[in-house]
Swiss-Prot record:
Annotated positions binding ATP: G116, S117, N118, G119, K120, S121, T122
UniProt cross-references to Gene3D superfamilies, sorted A to Z: Mur ligase, C-terminal domain (3.90.190.20), Mur-like, catalytic domain (3.40.1190.10), NAD(P)-binding Rossmann-like Domain (3.40.50.720)
Free-text function comment from the UniProt entry: Cell wall formation. Catalyzes the addition of glutamate to the nucleotide precursor UDP-N-acetylmuramoyl-L-alanine (UMA).
Subcellular location: Cytoplasm
Similarity comment: Belongs to the MurCDEF family.
Pfam families with a match to the protein in the record: Mur_ligase_C, Mur_ligase_M, MurD-like_N
Protein name listed in UniProt: UDP-N-acetylmuramoylalanine--D-glutamate ligase
Superkingdom: Bacteria
Gene assigned in the entry: murD
């Protein structure tokens, strides 16, 4: 193979495939490299683009140093030695979102950008539902669902994008109508040097937006520099802010909806809803579609999702809580619950500091830990229970719970030490919880014979 490839795609998977599709539509045949021996998407690449070469098992520097542009997948750290060497040689290193931004650069602002440690998918979906209710021609994607470059294959008027810190590291020219950073808490500390480095990766989105929407109850989300900005929160708003007053969601002095009519549960989700309303407002969506969605949207799978109710015990799947902040938010959101909370927590902590959990463990009657970093979390609360598996954790929780209690899976950790992803973890919890009802019915049937 001749060493003449000017465009490299590093990392295959769904994002890498979308980059290849886009470049090939532009008449560019890239070279693809992946550090894995058998990367996901390899068969699809060969089927769709037999002319595109794939090198696996590492990044060959001979190709990197001759490239004019390298497009990296979000999972590849920009400080990977081979990538850093290319950057030091002034070779352009970008991501798929930056390619997307350049593709739409001649259009009027048509993007809503959403980042934050937690709640991104919920807010992105909510804004999408509001756009749908308003009859807009829209598309939702990015870190949720469809890769951004695949969204370009159909003409739309509004793009609603969930954006991770990894994606924002390589994005510089996204021209948003409005953008938000919902919250900041420790996450991906195995990739970032400290919380501030992670925060700055998130806040880079504000510099690429006409308006910044920050969380006034989380000072870490405030823009670094003065700009066209507004805020949201659960407190009473001032001037043009979004918030809550007398049990009602309000924009300034304008009432939008009563919290009593909102379908989604938990104070953290009410904050997510308010953020979505503010973003939708700046996209020209009026009050009625917001109200319609607020009354009907009950939440996403694996996010404080009620999966079973057995013997008056609620089993709630919050497997998407892959960091400490998400679990803190879940426990605070359920803070008004009258029964006990039995919490199942643990997994791969990604180098995070677990001590903030101590502040909310007073809301937890029984703590059950599992996974790689379960013991570190167990040390934060006396008389915790250790589980060897999810099945063991659910069994222990069922034995501890009484009528009116909640069994909450909110791990505060990634799932990769035990599962393929957080969805698989949540599905396992759901199946185990729902199986309890089958066992109960079987035992009752036997007793009646």
């Amino acid at each position: 193979m001749e060493l003449d490839n000017s465009h490299l795609v590093l990392g295959l998977g769904a994002t890498g495939l979308s980059v290849v599709r886009y470049l090939c539509r532009q008449g560019i045949t890239p070279l693809v490299m992946d550090s894995r021996d058998q990367p996901p998407g390899a068969e699809q690449l060969a089927l769709e683009f037999p002319e595109v070469n794939l090198i696996t098992g590492g990044f060959d520097c001979r190709y990197l140093v001759q490239a004019s542009q390298i497009v990296i997948s979000p999972g590849i750290a920009i400080d990977t030695p081979e990538i850093r060497a290319a950057i030091d040689m002034d070779i352009e290193v970008i991501g798929d979102v930056e390619l997307f931004a350049r593709a739409i650069k001649d259009r009027s602002p048509c993007v809503i950008g959403i980042t934050g440690s937690n709640g991104k998918s919920t807010v992105t979906t909510l804004v999408g539902e509001m756009a749908k209710a308003a009859g807009l021609n829209y598309a939702v994607g990015g870190n949720i669902g469809i890769p951004v470059l695949d969204l370009l294959q159909k003409p739309v008027d509004l793009y609603i994008l969930e954006l991770s810190s990894f994606q924002l590291e390589t994005t510089h020219s996204l021209n948003c109508i409005s953008a938000t950073c919902l919250n900041i808490s420790e996450d991906h500390m195995d990739r970032y040097s400290d919380l501030e480095a992670y925060r700055q990766a998130k806040l880079a989105l504000y510099d690429q937006s006409k308006r910044a929407l920050f969380n006034r109850e989380d000072s870490l989300t405030q823009p670094n520099d003065p700009m066209n900005q507004n805020s949201f929160g659960l407190t009473s708003p001032v001037n043009d802010e979004w918030g809550v007053k007398d049990g009602k969601i309000v924009h300034g002095t304008t009432e939008i909806a009563s919290l009593q009519d909102v379908a989604i549960v938990g104070s953290h989700n009410h904050a997510n809803l308010i953020a979505a309303m503010a973003l939708a407002y700046h996209a020209g969506i009026d009050k009625e579609p917001m109200i319609q969605v607020a009354k009907n949207f009950t939440g996403l799978a694996h996010r404080c999702e009620l999966v079973a109710n057995i013997a008056a015990v609620a089993y709630v799947n919050d497997s998407k809580a892959t960091n400490v902040g998400a679990t803190v938010a879940a426990l605070e959101g359920l803070g008004e619950h009258l029964g006990d909370i039995i919490l199942i927590v643990g997994g791969d902590g990604k180098g995070a500091d677990f001590t903030p959990l101590e502040t909310v463990f007073n809301k937890v009657a029984h703590l059950i830990t599992l996974g790689k970093d379960g013991d570190k979390i167990a040390a934060l609360k006396e008389h915790s229970h250790k589980a060897d598996s999810m099945a063991d954790a659910v069994k222990q929780a069922a034995e501890l719970a009484t009528a009116g209690d909640i069994v909450l899976l909110s791990p505060a950790c990634a799932s990769l030490d035990m599962y393929k992803n957080f969805m698989a973890r949540g599905d396992d919890f759901r199946q185990l919880a729902q199986a309890l009802s089958v066992e109960t019915l079987d035992s009752e049937a036997s007793a009646d014979v």
